């Protein structure tokens, strides 16, 4: 099977040809200035008169290649310490500019907005993302291999927006000390995109075509003259003081004050050392409540700032969730999920020439039967050709207990974005090999994935082996002892009709088999999505699954799934309203067979944005199951209320409940941004548990 997948992918890529793209991307020289403009969203300083100007935007959606409906003007300049952008988004109906979102770390998807990508190394494989909405919201992230941004990254930068009589304006400052770059690289990748939300119109500077996403960095333009850049001392120290009061059932109260320090030092403009003492994560966002009715563990993403910073340097083998050799979420938690305090942590991340480094060491305090210990993760990759990499990963230590454990891995990522001549089609081939050793359990795994990540056709096919005893102590494995095949095919059809923007056809197929080749589970899904020109979608689909149970499984207290081979088919459908509406919803309904019985489900999310200061959201997931072993219902609700009186102040209240644990969780957070990079938090967590029938 493995050889067959490789052969199919190689033949596919060979048929595509290997002619290099001849498309010439636009470029602009960035003028250096002496003075620093005031970031206030006005653009009235004399320095802006010296800035280079970009005006040649092309329409991407809804009518690719046609004239844009509104003019956009981008001003670019820099000092030796920062890059400055001034963007004038002209609009002949300024009263209709959508500017309702003020939140930091929000993409402002319902507002008129700008999206910017910067590639300081000009390799076309990864870069930085900056999102700005007309209401003042801002977001940042890391772009890798044409995928959507990883929004966990947090950058120190500044932006101010202002709605004017001519449209709206954004003024942006990106300090060079906040991003990694190569001092000898004077030409950077750069692209900018504007969205006029009420028209669902998308305009772009470089590669204004549906065939390339903004995040496909190989399609970016160039900004030149990026020389003699400075990062200052390269030292950033962030002291913090956490006061915590805890009240438990029974009347016991505790109060403590914990000081901590985070320090960042840029060894070079592209290499950073991070140190953290008495790391505290009180300000971390809570996980969304979910109910697990499967036989396998759930995956929860990392949300702690210390581990999210430069997390991309530890990515391995293109693996999304399982089997991960390293998942930092395991650090600071014992095997039974109890919190283990982190005494000290250190990282070295960045680039040295063609080498990419990620080194992490953490000292854990002893708690709950887990002795004090140190854990380590190291990741090194080497840039091949223009867009490819090979690398290794090593982890040492077991944060879950007192045993010893090591993981070793080798991977490669081959990418070429020059297929089919000037059309610039991209092909990728990713492979990995992993070995774990610890407490007498030694095993290995491997994986191979081929990707054709293009538009209108997208394809991904992969196969991986996960050994029965493969157990990365600092990673995550959902299901050991299997061969796992997965595939996904998508085609976007531009309708050209009056009401529809595009129609998407998606098909996925996958199976798990034991190491002897016996099928354990199968999953086939086909769905069609209709995207309206004014925003919003309609979706219908069908799914067929097969599950083999080799032993009885208690899906819920008293509800047993007997040994057997179960096949079931379900249909689903739903819709979502445009994100530009003040109120709206997303609904998905499903019904059909399930494990020898029936299941009906509803997944509903509603939002209301009455003004730029207030926003609320409620989501409900409800499943009704009628099985031979018994009937049961799962009900999960998540709600949030947000108040943003200014772009610097955010108050959020989250409420969560599920009917299985019968627990209500309440999380209140106040975040005051004193200045970019300096925040004050006030956090309240409350858990309510039903103790009796009343």
What is each residue range found by the language model?
Residues 341, 418, 422-425, 430-694:
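Exposed, low-structure sequence patches enriched in small/polar residues
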Residues 4-15:
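Bacterial N-terminal signal peptides
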Residues 175-181, 216-230, 245, 267-271, ...:
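Outer-membrane beta-barrel proteins
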Residues 207-230, 364-422, 538-592, 601, ...:
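Outer-membrane beta-barrel transmembrane domain signature of Gram-negative proteins
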Residues 247-251, 367-369, 399-402, 514-516, ...:
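A generic structural signal for short coil/turn motifs at secondary-structure boundaries
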Residues 21-383, 391-392, 402:
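Structural preference for beta-rich elements and adjacent junctions enriched in aromatics
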Residues 239, 257-263, 271, 277, ...:
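Extended, hydrophobic alpha-helical segments in both membrane/secreted and soluble proteins
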